[in-house]
Each structure stands twice: as C-alpha cells, then as structure tokens.
Amino acid sequence: MPFHPVTAALMYRGIYTVPNLLSEQRPVDIPEDELEEIREAFKVFDRDGNGFISKQELGTAMRSLGYMPNEVELEVIIQRLDMDGDGQVDFEEFVTLLGPKLSTSGIPEKFHGTDFDTVFWKCDMQKLTVDELKRLLYDTFCEHLSMKDIENIIMTEEESHLGTAEECPVDVETCSNQQIRQTCVRKSLICAFAIAFIISVMLIAANQVLRSGMK
C-alpha cells in the first residue's frame, strides 16, 4: 500500500474538535463502505500487514508523509491510540478513536455523495486525459487540495496498481469504464484526506502532552 503525500491544508476543518476526539474512546457505528475506506487508511500505516501498527511503522509512515516525529512524540502518540496497553494499535482501536472523524460526516462534502459524483459527469470520461483530470479535480477541490496533492495522489495510485489488474486502476488513459474510474479516484481522495487528518490528530495529541509535561 503506497503512502499519500498530502499537505496540512487538508486538516484545518477538523482540528478544532481534536480535544474532544482524543478524550472520547467509545464504539462507533460506521457504515460498511466507510469502514472499508478507513481500513485502507489503516493499511497505509500497517506496512507488514499483520493487523497492527507498531511504533516503528507509525514513524516510517509519518516520515514518508513529510513529518519528523522524535521518539518521545511517537511514544506519546502510540499511548494515545493503544487502548489495551499492548504497545501497538489494532484496527478496532484505530476505528474507535478516529472513526467518527474519518467517516463521511468528518470529510468535506465535496469528497462524497452527489457533489462529488457530479464532477465526473461534466465531461466525457472516456476521452479525459490525465492533465484534464488533474484540472477538473483541482477546480473542484482547490479549497482542500493543491495541484501538487492531486498529482501525487494520481501518480501514487498509478504506481500502486501496476501489474495488479484486479485492483481499481487510476490510469485514466487506459481505463475503459467510467464508473470504475470515478470510484477509484474518489477512493484515493478520501484516503488522502483521512490520512492527513490522522497525522494531524496524532501530532496535536503529542504536542499537547509534551507541553503539559513542560509546565
């Protein structure tokens, strides 16, 4: 599973809820389709695919996204996410803490539902080039994504699906089905937003604890 380079611009809408999010550790009721999208975000961190996020995997993922946490910050973040105290984070812990903000209720409206789907009916998707797709996505999501973000998402998804025909491709030059293309790009964007929010929550949690310890 590739890493998605995204910027802090994706995070701002949810940051004011972080203190409440960190203090509430209760079961969440998330639709199955949204749960699968959150599972994709979890896999970005779970590099060895064993179903757990270790401190080392967390550090690797964050550094790949441009963040440079030190060992103390990583330890604080893991402690925040690790509810059963086993030193690692499983998917249930991941969903319980972060699920409410990673479901559609916590993602900008343009990333899901009718608003998003409408974007893909403005033109002939069968004839859309990669550059045209980039421009279309930027015009629609410029409040949340830079052109560089969009290019990184498309490039990363193309690389991740090379030689994997059963997976949903983002290669818009060769993809022959409009619905597949639409679903795949939407999935990539939601995953990118989710990962950005996860990183923001983790860093804010670590900084809050570190500041408290300095007082």
UniProtKB/Swiss-Prot annotation:
Per the record, a Pfam family? Answer: EF-hand_7
**Topological domains (Extracellular): residue ranges?**
210-215
Its membrane topology is listed as:
Single-pass type IV membrane protein
Cytoplasmic side, ranges: 1-188
Q: Name one GO cellular component term.
A: perinuclear region of cytoplasm
Family annotation (InterPro entries): Ca-binding_regulatory, EF-hand-dom_pair, EF_Hand_1_Ca_BS, EF_hand_dom, S100/CaBP7/8-like_CS
Task: Give compartment(s).
Answer: Golgi apparatus, trans-Golgi network membrane; Cytoplasm, Perinuclear region; Cell membrane
Chain positions recorded as Ca(2+) 2 binding sites: 82, 84, 86, 88, 93
Name the Gene Ontology molecular function terms of this record. Answer: calcium ion binding
Q: EF-hand domain location, by residue?
A: 33-68, 69-104
Main subcellular location: Golgi
Q: Which SUPFAM superfamilies match?
A: EF-hand
The entry's Ca(2+) 1-binding residues are: 46, 48, 50, 57
Keyword set includes Metal-binding: yes
Keywords from the named record: Calcium, Cell membrane, Cytoplasm, Golgi apparatus, Membrane, Metal-binding, Repeat, Transmembrane, Transmembrane helix
The residues that cross the membrane are 189-209
Q: How is this protein organized at the quaternary level?
A: Interacts with PI4KB. This binding competes with FREQ/NCS1 binding in a calcium-dependent manner.
Q: What is known of its domains?
A: The C-terminal transmembrane domain (TMD) is necessary and sufficient for membrane targeting.
PANTHER family, A to Z: CALCIUM-BINDING PROTEIN 7 (PTHR46311:SF1), CALCIUM-BINDING PROTEIN 8-RELATED (PTHR46311)
Instruction: Quote the function comment for this protein.
Output: Negatively regulates Golgi-to-plasma membrane trafficking by interacting with PI4KB and inhibiting its activity.
What is the recorded name of this protein? Calcium-binding protein 7
Organism lineage string: Eukaryota, Metazoa, Chordata, Craniata, Vertebrata
This protein's gene is called CABP7
